[in-house]
Regions:
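Short boundary segments that mark the start of a structured unit
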Residues: 1-54
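Structural recognition of the beta-strand scaffold that forms the well-ordered cores
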Residues: 64-69, 108-116, 154-160, 193-199, ...
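Substrate-binding surface in catalytic domains of secreted glycosidases
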Residues: 129-130, 198-308
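Generic structural signal for well-ordered alpha-helices
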Residues: 138-146, 180-187, 217-225, 288-294
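Solvent-exposed, acidic/flexible segments
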Residues: 134-141, 172-176, 180, 210-218, ...
Length: 308
């Protein structure tokens, strides 16, 4: 039968390195087994796109900025519309001479949200839910994502809770392994640059759901780093109870969470108040917010923490 003739799933990835933009014809021949004459040729038409650098150069060195972009409301290329200029302190002339107006765009990391952790009550699985809008953006990635990456930005997905009562802080070991595998598939398939963890909207405490614990989230971060490797970004938004114990390796099961992170930053923002500077390493200083006292994340270089 046709079913019996199917091989195991094979993944083939074409790399466009050193190829000029254009269309290429690739005949791929698959043999049933070595030494047989039976084979099948599959013809691929592959389009290689030209890099799109846009109108403005990215100012990536002097200002480290992270964008969160809600794909339900905005398209990712909006990031390129945020501009800044720099003046020479001595002459008051444009310090960036590649344009007459001296403008550059900003944004080292673009986190696309939201991608949520859902719960399947029938199977007990923690499921990655991209949502229709995010999936549309990813399915049109050459239009919405690649131009941002061409300029040097890192484009990641922001992982959040899905309001089911299951979140990063109450996963079983089996759920962690399963969920990480799902995330890795998306990152690999779409050639994204990593993930951002922001544990909010999980709705912990729902009837029938496990209580929060202090080891699940650190295990998840560690497993994600090990799955994605060091070539992808793993970042953390430091926000409220889910991350408040990350300073204490006794609570985290011996895991120094910061060892598995590229960056972390404060998630506290209130548009009705002045800018809140959250600096766990200088708590008590006059400039540091007293509304949101935090402790240093174990193993994290202070230079890798965004205070605003």
């Amino acid at each position: 039968s046709a079913e019996n003739q199917r091989s195991a799933l094979k993944r083939i990835r074409f790399m466009a390195e050193n190829l000029a933009p254009g269309e290429y014809y690739l005949p791929l021949t698959v043999a049933e087994e070595a030494g047989t004459e039976e084979h099948q040729t599959i013809n691929y038409l592959i389009s290689i796109r030209a890099r799109q650098l846009g109108e403005y150069k990215l100012n990536a060195d002097q200002v480290f900025a992270v964008f969160y972009l809600d794909t339900e409301k905005y398209q990712p290329l909006l990031v390129d519309e945020y501009l800044m200029s720099k003046l020479d302190a001595n002459t008051w002339e444009n310090a960036w001479s590649e344009r007459e107006d001296g403008l550059r765009t900003i944004g080292n990391i673009v986190n696309l949200n939201k991608v949520v952790l859902d719960y399947d009550a029938e199977t007990g699985r923690a499921l990655l839910n991209l949502g229709n809008d995010m999936r549309y953006v990813l399915d049109h990635i050459d239009k919405y994502i690649r131009p941002l990456q061409d300029k040097g930005r890192k484009v990641c997905i922001c992982l959040e809770g899905g309001g089911t009562g299951l979140g990063f802080c109450n996963l079983t070991d089996a759920q962690i392994v399963d969920f990480v595998a799902q995330v890795k598939t998306v990152i690999t398939e779409y050639a994204l640059d990593g993930v951002n963890f922001w544990d909010r909207n999980a709705a912990y405490g729902k009837e029938g759901m496990p209580a929060m614990n202090t080891t699940s989230y650190p295990k998840l971060i560690k497993a994600m780093r090990e799955a994605l490797g060091n070539d992808k970004l793993v970042t953390l938004t430091d926000y409220e109870a889910p991350t408040e114990y990350f300073w204490d390796t006794g609570a985290t099961g011996g895991i120094e969470v910061g060892q598995y992170l590229d960056y972390a930053w404060s998630g506290y923002l209130d548009n009705e108040k002045n800018v809140q500077i959250v600096d766990p390493w200088h708590q008590g200083q006059q400039y540091v917010s007293t509304d949101h006292p935090r402790k240093p994340i174990a193993g994290l270089d202070p230079a890798k923490y965004g205070c605003i």
